[in-house]
């Protein structure tokens, strides 16, 4: 057995334990005084000092002495341990004789790991040295006992890259070879050097490497560092020199990457790194990753690094110090071994199996499609069946009337289309009756068979049915019925005289009639409303001239949709003044529309009445980075809601008529209401402006760019009306023991309310009695959630200020680890890119020392780039086999397809079932 120790008994150590596969082997140990992890005394127990991968290279050469004189034919097991004051963790179990690699039998590896950790952690002694020695001896005996039961696997050569240090290399990868291979760089060189006599200018180095423009400064520093190392002078290089540069920065070995990184920091080439040089590279890395807060505090963070690596205040650090710091592997990686075997099995199972029989493939696809969409399917089949039945009924009815003799099948098609049109014009109002849907969702069990989450989508589907009905009805009349009536001879037209009077002689006769002009006006108004409601116009996705852009957007959608008030009035008139129907009870248009119109009108009146009798008073207003406005207001008496629901907000100072939906970010147990509103359109921009006028820069210790507290006095806050709450998909999270909450940008708002609700339920009896009594039916009753995974993906570092207090509160109160928080900042390059290496190092230092993340400013440690969603699902499936997981997503539609497909894939191929729910906004 060989173990390396630091200079202090408080230091954490990483040892190599070798036990021969024989119980006759004697236990020996030696202590080597290798170079310490830090420059200076290591009297401070700050962090584990991980073993350098280089120290393992000579282990096979010493196997005889370690084994107590055994021959070369013995097989050894190499175990990497992380020994701390009160615990021992196992990094890996490997074959060590003549080569390495993990044990071929994963079950044996896991058994060995559990045996060692149990044995080592149960061994105590008076001194650290004796404790360590006795632990390792005890572990050696346990190891031989385990291995004596099974045959030894084949011996393999030790591979340096399989050691624990390889985990640290993620912070030093410079360019991902899978996306930036040499052929692509070669082609870009030819293009960029065409006008400079075959030389690549340093100013174009970033472009040649395939970096984006934001990394231009970083690439320039990289160019300078490589030029100094290779004795290249000037600001231009040849293709041969570029190839040398490329080989150095794409070298996957640790030493090569570390040397390049050090060269970038050590600009004066004296082999030492000063605090000023560290600050400059921090500022450069922060700029490349759009981390403005870190860039502003570069000097403070440089001082933190120097404090860590230069405890003797020498004023500089050496490459050895930097190397040992970068070798710090996350503690989490040590503890992940328990699920590794199951994870590997799951990976094998998730590999797509190719079915040779096309019939079997199609049958599988159809089966899964039905299972995944049965709620939508039966609703769609019912709707299509009703439309088809109504069309057929009217078609047959008019085929047996006198009008058929003059106009033929045209009148049958027109009347069939009209019947479906009346039905759909009535039905389209129901999906937007929010109060009714919320009541059905909360008070009935219909949610198990009716997909209330798709109400807006069904509203759009019905709109397409209306378009089809208009085309059939108006098209058949204009292109077929009217021309036939005009062109018919006297004998043929005679049966129509009692309906139309004297035979029409032109189109104008039909247009000037009530039926004609009401129909034309309705078609024009519906065409305007439908067009501006499409995503291209409603979300301003089209590149239109500025004067046309003012006629699009949400405001245009909102106001033009109110044209349907005129449309419905004209539709009733149109249905009364029918040419071919004279008996009142056969004029059924008003019968179709009566109940839906009354229901929808009642909801609009209820909104106006409820918002006026339940006024709210502003408590606090804050303006955050990223153009986000936070409104905290009093909660009206009797306003009961569930986390995940939303409410409508109206501000008369902006527009007296517009109501906009926003997710509630406060929890049901809170004595206030809060919403977070991001500036995305005209209305939200004006709202932010009117509230910013009453705000001031925050005092010390408070977040936000601008802030105003209601307790400061009678501030002239603009009057705000609210209406709600209304049901939303996220409110169903309580149905699941385990939930995966995903928020993209401002889409985190409903998830924040859910997290706060979970926190309030964790407090239990400690909650204030008034809050508990006011919301007793919303909290503990029926609360099933026992584990929550929250993934918040945001583009800007400043976004983390929106919910900073909540994140810290969760970190402080969640002692049982019920909530697992993951913040992702996509402006930061992915882990493994050089532009993020120093940020990752700094993040680990700051979090270890102060418990605060340098990116988010909270106690929650942030991740870089975008999440690997497949790995997220895989992790949850491994940790919760046989469970049903609720997946709730809120954000832009770009991620919906990936998250939904992964939920379906894992549900089909594992015992863990994922139910995907998305928020519509």
Swiss-Prot record:
Region (EF-hand-like 1): 193-203
Broad class of where this protein is predominantly found: membrane
Residue positions, PTM Phosphoserine: 8-9, 26, 39, 339, 343, 347
Presence of the UniProt keyword Metal-binding in the record: yes
Disruption-associated phenotype: Plants do not accumulate reactive oxygen species during disease-resistance reactions, do not up-regulate UV-B-dependent gene expression and are impaired in abscisic acid-induced stomatal closing and in root growth and seed germination inhibitions.
Domain Ferric oxidoreductase, residue spans: 415-572
Topological region Cytoplasmic: 1-376, 483-516, 581-588, 756-921
PTM comment text: Phosphorylated at Ser-39, Ser-343 and Ser-347 by BIK1 upon flagellin (flg22) treatment. Activated by phosphorylation at Ser-347 mediated by SIK1 and at Ser-8, Ser-9 and Ser-339 upon flagellin (e.g. flg22) perception.
Keywords: Calcium, FAD, Flavoprotein, Membrane, Metal-binding, NADP, Oxidoreductase, Peroxidase, Phosphoprotein, Plant defense, Repeat, Transmembrane, Transmembrane helix
Regulation: Inhibited by diphenylene iodinium (DPI).
EC numbers on record: 1.11.1.-, 1.6.3.-
Membrane topology: Multi-pass membrane protein
Extracellular membrane side: 398-461, 538-559, 607-734
Coiled coil segments of this chain: none
CDD domains associated with the record: EFh, NOX_Duox_like_FAD_NADP
Residue stretches making up the FAD-binding FR-type domain: 611-732
GO process annotations (BP): carbohydrate homeostasis; cellular response to hypoxia; defense response to fungus; negative regulation of programmed cell death; osmosensory signaling pathway; reactive oxygen species metabolic process; response to heat; response to wounding
A Pfam family it matches: FAD_binding_8
Family listed: Belongs to the RBOH (TC 5.B.1.3) family.
Protein name (database record): Respiratory burst oxidase homolog protein D
């Amino acid at each position: 057995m060989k173990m390396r120790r630091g200079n202090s008994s408080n230091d954490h150590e990483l040892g190599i334990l070798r036990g021969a596969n024989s119980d006759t082997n004697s236990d020996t140990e030696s202590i080597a005084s290798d170079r310490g992890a830090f420059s200076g005394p290591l009297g401070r127990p700050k962090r584990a000092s991980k073993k350098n991968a280089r120290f393992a290279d000579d282990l096979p050469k010493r196997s005889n002495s370690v084994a107590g004189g055994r021959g070369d034919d013995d097989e050894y097991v190499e175990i990497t341990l992380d020994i701390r004051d009160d615990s021992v963790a196992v990094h890996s179990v490997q074959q060590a004789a003549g080569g390495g690699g993990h044990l071929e039998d994963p079950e044996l590896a896991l058994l060995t790991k559990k045996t060692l950790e149990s044995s080592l952690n149960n061994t105590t002694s008076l001194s650290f040295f004796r404790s360590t020695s006795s632990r390792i001896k005890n572990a050696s005996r346990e190891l031989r006992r385990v291995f004596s039961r099974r045959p030894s696997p084949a011996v393999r050569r030790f591979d340096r890259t399989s050691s624990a240090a390889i985990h640290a290399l993620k912070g030093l990868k410079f360019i991902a070879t899978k996306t930036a291979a040499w052929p692509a760089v070669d082609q870009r060189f030819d293009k960029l050097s065409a006008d400079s006599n075959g030389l690549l200018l340093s100013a174009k180095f970033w472009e040649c490497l395939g970096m984006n423009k934001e990394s231009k400064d970083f690439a320039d520093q990289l160019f300078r560092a490589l030029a100094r190392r290779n004795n290249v002078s000037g600001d231009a290089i040849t293709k041969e020199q570029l190839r040398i540069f490329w080989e150095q920065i794409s070298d996957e070995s640790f030493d090569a990457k570390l040397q390049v990184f050090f060269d970038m920091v050590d600009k004066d080439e004296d082999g030492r790194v000063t605090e000023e040089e560290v600050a400059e590279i921090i500022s450069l890395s922060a700029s490349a990753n759009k981390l403005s807060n870190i860039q502003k505090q570069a000097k403070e963070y440089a001082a933190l690094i120097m404090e860590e690596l230069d405890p003797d205040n020498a004023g500089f650090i050496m490459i050895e110090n930097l190397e040992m710091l970068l070798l710090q592997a996350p503690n989490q990686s040590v503890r992940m071994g328990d699920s590794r075997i199951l994870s590997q099995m799951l990976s094998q199972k998730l590999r797509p199996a190719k079915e040779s029989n096309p019939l079997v493939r199609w049958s599988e696809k159809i089966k899964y499609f039905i299972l995944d969409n049965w709620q939508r399917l039966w609703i769609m089949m019912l709707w299509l069946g009703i439309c088809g039945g109504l069309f057929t009924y009217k078609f047959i009815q008019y085929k047996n009337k006198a009008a058929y003799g003059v106009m033929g099948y045209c009148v049958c098609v027109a009347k069939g289309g009209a019947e479906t049109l009346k039905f759909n014009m009535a039905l389209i109002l129901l999906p937007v009756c929010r109060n009714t849907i919320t009541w059905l969702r909360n008070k009935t069990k219909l949610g198990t068979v009716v997909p209330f989450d798709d109400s807006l989508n069904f509203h759009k589907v019905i709109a397409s049915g209306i378009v089809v009905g208009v085309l059939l009805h108006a098209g058949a009349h204009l292109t077929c019925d009217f021309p036939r009536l005009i062109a018919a001879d006297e004998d043929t037209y005679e049966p129509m005289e009692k309906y139309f009077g004297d035979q029409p002689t032109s189109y104008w006769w039909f247009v000037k009639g009530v039926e004609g002009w009401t129909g034309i006006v309705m078609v024009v108004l519906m065409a305007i409303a439908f067009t501006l409601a499409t995503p291209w116009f409603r979300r301003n996705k089209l590149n239109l001239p500025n004067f046309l852009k003012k006629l699009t957007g949400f405001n245009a959608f909102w106001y033009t949709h109110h044209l349907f008030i005129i449309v419905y009035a004209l539709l009733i008139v149109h249905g009364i003044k029918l040419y071919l129907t004279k008996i009142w009870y056969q004029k059924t248009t008003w019968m179709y529309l009566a109940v839906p119109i009354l229901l929808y009108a009642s909801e609009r009146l209820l909104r106006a009445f409820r918002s006026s009798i339940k006024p709210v008073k502003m408590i606090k207003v804050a303006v955050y980075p990223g153009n986000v406005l936070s409104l905290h207001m009093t909660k009206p008496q009797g306003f009961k809601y569930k986390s995940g629901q939303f409410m409508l907000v109206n501000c008369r100072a902006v527009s007296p008529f517009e109501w906009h939906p926003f997710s509630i970010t406060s929890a049901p147990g809170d004595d206030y209401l809060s919403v977070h509103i991001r500036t995305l359109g005209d209305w939200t921009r004006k709202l932010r402006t009117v509230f910013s006028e009453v705000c001031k820069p925050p005092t010390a210790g408070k977040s936000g760019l601008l802030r105003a507290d209601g307790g400061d006095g009678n501030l002239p806050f603009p009057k705000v009306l609210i209406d709600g709450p209304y049901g939303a998909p996220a409110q169903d999270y309580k149905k699941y023991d385990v939930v995966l909450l995903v928020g993209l940008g401002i889409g985190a708002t409903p998830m924040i309310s859910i997290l706060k609700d979970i926190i309030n339920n964790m407090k239990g009896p400690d909650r204030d009695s008034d809050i508990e009594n006011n919301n007793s039916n919303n909290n503990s009753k029926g609360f099933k959630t026992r584990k929550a995974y929250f993934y918040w993906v945001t583009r800007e570092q400043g976004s983390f200020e929106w919910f900073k207090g909540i994140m810290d509160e969760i970190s402080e109160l969640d002692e049982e680890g019920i909530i697992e928080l993951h913040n992702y900042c996509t402006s930061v390059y992915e882990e493994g890119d050089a532009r993020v290496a120093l940020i990752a190092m700094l993040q680990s230092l700051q979090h270890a020392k102060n418990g605060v993340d340098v990116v988010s400013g909270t106690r929650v440690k942030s991740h870089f780039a975008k999440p690997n969603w497949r790995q997220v699902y895989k992790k949850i499936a491994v940790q919760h086999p046989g469970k049903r997981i609720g997946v709730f997503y809120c954000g832009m539609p770009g991620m919906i397809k990936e998250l939904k497909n992964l939920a379906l894939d894992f549900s089909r191929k594992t015992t863990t079932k994922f139910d995907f729910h998305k928020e519509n906004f």
